[in-house]
A protein has these predicted regions:
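N-terminal export signals
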Residues: 7-27, 112
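C-terminal segment of N-terminal export signals and the immediately downstream linker at the start
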Residues: 1, 5, 21-55
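Mature-region segments of soluble proteins
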Residues: 50, 68-188
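Post-signal-peptide N-terminal segment of Sec-exported extracytoplasmic proteins
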Residues: 44-75
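Structural motif
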Residues: 40-46, 63-64, 135-142
Length: 188
């Protein structure tokens, strides 16, 4: 799977454009100077793992936490996002926790799975409405960033790829008529 194809799939799945997509296409470049306030703590990574696990929970396949999506998000935000989007992402983590406190009376980390799902569903609707009226100069919605990074991190991870797709590590000859039955995994 090529990077462009993945970006198209993530954009279609989240109903918008991929935030920072031009940087992903060009390749991420680490900055020599770390932007003030963008360091992620172990607690931040655990928080992002829980957000990602709520979006892609463990079922018969690995969940986002098992794929270490929280760690993936931190690398992508620090190395690939512009400073404005980094700031939005960090502030968004706080906003998400505050929204959980407002909706359920406790932090996201203490919330039950049903409360987490309810919160993220409402944030997803909010993000979609925001994107309908967003102007180019407006900041991106923090939840859309988290959701896109969750999908990208999960489906490019080893457990996400191998357990959800018919992954063939060594390419064979081209066969344009591979038999496919409903319910089979996609070939990648």
């Amino acid at each position: 799977m090529e990077r462009r194809e993945l970006l198209k799939m993530v954009a279609l799945a989240t109903g918008g454009v991929v935030i920072g997509g031009e940087l992903f296409l060009a390749g991420c470049k680490s900055k020599d100077v770390e932007v003030a306030g963008t360091a992620f703590s172990a607690d931040n990574i655990a928080f992002l793992d829980e957000v990602a696990e709520t979006i892609i929970p463990k079922t018969t396949t690995a969940g986002a936490k098992e794929a270490e999506v929280g760690k993936f998000m931190t690398v992508m935000v620090n190395d690939c996002y512009e400073e404005a989007d980094q700031k939005t992402f960090h502030e968004g983590m706080k906003k998400l926790d505050e929204a959980c406190n407002k909706m359920h009376g406790h932090s996201f980390m203490k919330a039950e799975p049903a409360h987490r799902k309810e919160l993220l569903t409402s944030l997803d609707k909010e993000a979609k409405e925001y994107m309908k009226s967003k102007k180019k100069e407006d900041p991106n919605h923090y939840f859309l960033m988290m959701k896109q990074l969750t999908l990208m991190g999960y489906f490019t991870s080893k457990p996400g790829l191998e357990q959800n797709f018919n992954y063939q590590q060594v390419p064979g000859k081209y066969d344009g008529a591979v038999p496919y039955k409903k319910g089979d995994k996609l070939f990648v």
